[in-house]
């Protein structure tokens, strides 16, 4: 890699329902960047800069089978400290956002960093906000010519659901990741309980036509599509929270065993999504491939999982990019983007 070494503050943890996943990402990113010779600070956005013992304890924790409950998150949020006032963060070259969900992914933290003139990884605040809002994102998919399943926002009448979506359908919070609060609904009787569950995790709830088929995913790095991957669900209807983060729950294949034309189309569509939402640095877009060979865009992730075995790093590995190199490239892309943004404003 041969460039100047960086001072990187890795932001992780936080107080969203994806806290455990973020800690796992942060642990791996910190280790990778340190192995490459960079100076790394570990910052839990719920509590601030971590000392050595705090860092060891927190980063050794594992992702549980279910997301943290609301009471646990309320305790974490009540102790929240100021993130950007710590003197130890002076001289940081870039903030690596190993955050998932909540204010770490929805543009809030990005706007704060922009206002402070700090360089950070991933997309800017407007792009992050658009991608996190599934309703807005799906409208942009369609505007870009990328097919996505029909949807309605709750509340919706029985007639609207029956005529526009049918059963089974997917019920999920409009602004959550990792399938938190998501249900597959097979009848009208199951619908209201599923809406109530999703409503615990956000103010808006989406109802979406269920697309049966193969689950494929495409990472984008520096405006280039990475090799396509497939998640072999093993009979599961959906790649849910438990199966995403428990070892051996599913099998992930990179590159996917797909006809070359379909793989190329998935890459083309992922790039269209990345550009339509004005994303930067890196992203990961998930699709369903139906029996007719049509690709349906499910969602785009602006801060995808960053453990060494997460989907984006697996895609990078299939392209010959090791995990430490991937983390460094993401850092340098963030620095370049923020320099460009500052120059444009001056």
From Swiss-Prot:
Keywords: ATP-binding, Cell shape, Cell wall biogenesis/degradation, Cytoplasm, Ligase, Magnesium, Manganese, Metal-binding, Nucleotide-binding, Peptidoglycan synthesis. Residues 138-332 form the ATP-grasp domain. Its EC number is 6.3.2.4. Mg(2+) 2 binds at residues 299, 301. InterPro entries: ATP-grasp (IPR011761), ATP_grasp_subdomain_1 (IPR013815), D-Ala_lig_Van_CS (IPR000291), D_ala_D_ala (IPR005905), Dala_Dala_lig_C (IPR011095), Dala_Dala_lig_N (IPR011127), PreATP-grasp_dom_sf (IPR016185). Pfam families: Dala_Dala_lig_C, Dala_Dala_lig_N. SUPFAM superfamilies: Glutathione synthetase ATP-binding domain-like, PreATP-grasp domain. It is found in: Cytoplasm. The keyword Chaperone does not apply. Its main location: cytoplasm. Gene3D superfamilies: 3.40.50.20, ATP-grasp fold, A domain, ATP-grasp fold, B domain. ATP binds at residues 164-217. Pathway: Cell wall biogenesis; peptidoglycan biosynthesis. Binds 2 magnesium or manganese ions per subunit. Its cofactor is Mg(2+); Mn(2+). One of its GO terms (biological process) is cell wall organization. Mg(2+) 1 binds at residues 286, 299. One of its GO terms (cellular component) is cytosol. It catalyses: 2 D-alanine + ATP = D-alanyl-D-alanine + ADP + phosphate + H(+). GO terms for molecular function: ATP binding; D-alanine-D-alanine ligase activity; metal ion binding. Belongs to the D-alanine--D-alanine ligase family. Cell wall formation. PANTHER family: D-ALANINE--D-ALANINE LIGASE, D-ALANINE--D-ALANINE LIGASE B. This is D-alanine--D-alanine ligase A. It comes from Pseudomonas aeruginosa (strain ATCC 15692 / DSM 22644 / CIP 104116 / JCM 14847 / LMG 12228 / 1C / PRS 101 / PAO1).
């Amino acid at each position: 890699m041969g460039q100047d070494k960086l001072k990187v503050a890795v932001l992780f943890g936080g107080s969203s329902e994806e806290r455990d996943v973020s800690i796992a990402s942060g642990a791996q990113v910190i280790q990778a960047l340190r192995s490459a010779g960079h100076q790394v600070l570990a910052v839990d956005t719920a509590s601030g800069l971590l000392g050595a013992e705090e860092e060891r304890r927190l980063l050794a924790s594992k992702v549980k089978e279910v997301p943290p409950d609301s009471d646990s998150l309320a305790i974490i949020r009540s102790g929240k400290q100021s993130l950007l006032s710590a003197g130890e963060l002076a001289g940081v070259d870039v903030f690596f956002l190993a955050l998932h969900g909540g204010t770490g992914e929805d543009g809030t933290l990005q706007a704060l960093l922009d206002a402070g003139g700090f360089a950070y990884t991933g997309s800017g605040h407007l792009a992050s906000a658009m991608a996190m809002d599934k309703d807005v994102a799906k409208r942009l998919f369609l505007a870009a010519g990328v097919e996505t399943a029909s949807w309605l926002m709750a509340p919706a009448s029985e007639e609207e659901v029956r005529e526009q979506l049918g059963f089974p359908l997917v019920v999920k919070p409009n602004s959550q990741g990792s399938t938190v609060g998501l249900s597959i609904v097979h009848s009208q009787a199951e619908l209201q309980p599923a809406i109530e569950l999703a409503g615990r995790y956000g103010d808006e709830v989406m109802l979406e036509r269920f697309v049966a088929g193969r689950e494929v995913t495409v990472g984008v790095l520096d405006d280039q599509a990475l090799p396509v991957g497939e998640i072999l669900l093993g009979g599961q209807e959906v790649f849910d929270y438990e199966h995403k983060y428990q070892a051996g729950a599913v099998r992930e294949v990179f590159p996917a065993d797909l006809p070359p034309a379909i793989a190329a189309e998935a890459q083309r569509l992922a790039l269209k999504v990345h550009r339509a939402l004005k994303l930067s640095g890196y992203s990961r877009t998930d699709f369903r491939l139906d029996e007719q060979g049509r690709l349906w865009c499910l969602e785009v992730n602006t801060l995808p999982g960053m453990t060494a075995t997460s989907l984006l790093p697996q895609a990078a590995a299939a392209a010959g990019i090791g995990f430490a190199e991937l983390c460094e490239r993401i850092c340098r892309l963030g620095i370049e983007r923020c320099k460009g943004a500052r120059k444009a404003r001056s």
